[in-house]
């Protein structure tokens, strides 16, 4: 006989920073395998790639992970995990003084976006008629942020350049032309962009806990790929 086709439930999510609602489905066995292999590698790039693959699969291809900022990847992944596996995740926390291990069960809905995701662009005027508009760097760029210098980060965060009514996007120019353009910008642009990058939204949950052995009060911020897998 023909193997049955299993109906999979779908649900809509209003992703922060995206106007339209996106339709998703929960993880399937194949996505769980992708995540398990990534978790076993303990390599942050593998975890990022796994999240991106799962998000693209579960959004029926509506989302391109390369267009998403890190906080959006994290936010979507947590919602997918809640719908697929459950609303809670167990962590083992350590005491900063005696290193005693403490079990902690977290409700994933306790994650909060810290930062202004509504203002996802910054306009920097170079003259009365000319300027650049920055966007939050994609997750793909942000995950390599520590490996990029200020010029490279700025280069990868330009949404478009305008002069009077004309608009030019980085995709219309060669990487060499864009690099030369950025290298010749006033130093004040780097300062303004640095302030913008400092306010990139992130997903965080602060946990205050007391050690069951020595009574020391501890605090930890749970965020990002360091804590997503487990």
Model-flagged regions — what are they?
Residues 1-230:
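Long C-terminal interaction/binding lobes of large macromolecular proteins
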């Amino acid at each position: 006989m023909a193997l049955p086709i299993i109906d999979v439930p779908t649900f809509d999510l209003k992703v922060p920073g995206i106007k339209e609602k996106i339709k998703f489905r929960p993880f399937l066995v194949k996505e769980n395998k992708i995540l398990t292999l990534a978790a076993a590698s303990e390599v942050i790039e593998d975890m990022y790639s796994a999240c991106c693959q799962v998000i693209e699969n579960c959004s029926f291809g509506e989302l391109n992970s390369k267009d998403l900022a890190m906080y959006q990847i994290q936010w979507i992944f947590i919602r997918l995990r809640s719908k697929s596996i459950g609303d809670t995740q167990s962590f083992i926390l350590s005491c900063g003084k005696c290193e005693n291990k403490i079990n902690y069960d977290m409700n994933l809905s306790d994650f909060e976006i810290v930062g202004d995701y509504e203002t996802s662009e910054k306009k920097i005027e170079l003259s009365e008629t000319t300027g650049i508009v920055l966007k939050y760097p994609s997750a793909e760029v942000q995950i390599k942020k520590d490996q990029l210098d200020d010029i490279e980060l700025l280069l990868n965060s330009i949404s478009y350049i305008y002069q009077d009514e004309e608009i030019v996007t980085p995709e219309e120019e060669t990487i060499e032309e864009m690099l030369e353009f950025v290298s010749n910008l006033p130093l004040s642009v780097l300062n303004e962009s640095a302030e913008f990058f400092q306010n990139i939204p992130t997903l965080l949950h602060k946990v205050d806990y007391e050690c069951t052995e020595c009574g020391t009060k501890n605090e930890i911020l749970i965020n990002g790929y360091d804590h997503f897998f487990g």
